[in-house]
Structure formats: C-alpha cells, structure tokens
Amino acid sequence: MTTEFLQISEKNIHILEKFITINTSENFTYYKKRNKEAINNHIVTVILHKEEEIIGYGHLDYEEKVWLGICVLQKYTRQGYGKKIMDFLLKEAKNKKIKQIYLSFYKNNVIAYQLYKKVGFESICKKNDVCYMVKNL
C-alpha cells in the first residue's frame, strides 16, 4: 500500500475534521486555537493517507510570515511520515517562490525538533515552552 497526499478544501473538509477528532497529541494545538475554516487562508493543506487510514497532516499558512505545521498520528511516528509531509510542504513552498518558512513547537517535542533540524530549520528563539525555528529556501 502506498501513501498519498490529499489536498484539503471546503469540498472535503470532513477528512480534516476526522483527523482533528482522532488526533490525541497534546503537541498539536493548531485547531484548538482556530476553527477548521482557517484552511481558507492556507497556502496549502494536506492529509497524508494510506487507503482509508489517515497518517498525518500538514499545512502552510500566512500570518504575517509563512508558517509550516505538521502532525503525524502517534501510531505512525518514527516511520518517516513526518519527513515525507515536510518534504512535500517544502517543495510546495519552493514552487510558490516562498523564501522563508517559520514553525513553532513545544520544547518537550523532541521528535519534532530532530525532524526540523534534519531538514535544515534553525532555532531562532524560545518563549516559555514554545520554540521557534526558521528555514531559508
């Protein structure tokens, strides 16, 4: 079984809703602070899936800067899916001529930090429990 990316829009937003419902990670709080209609302001929003099984989520959005967000469901972590989502989003950013991408994560999320360093993000600051990183494309 191969994995595929599905671009999320208003037409298939129910798939994003399913992801939000089944994701139990305390490290992914994006939709706790926003409603699902936030995708209307995204540059790209994708779900990585294998047949009917959702594996993870990723997006690029613009809030004064371009921000990248990803989340892999717990049972799929450390299997290369985070890197696959990251590579897809970075390619999308390059295709759209984006020059710089930011991300944030909770400092206790060591798995995320390792992935972000691996793909070339650099730490820029920490505020309380949140770390910020940037990558020039």
Q: Which residues does each predicted region cover?
A:
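Acetyl-CoA-dependent GNAT
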Residues: 7-75, 92
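A generic structural signal for beta-strand entry/edge sites
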Residues: 65-67, 100, 128-130
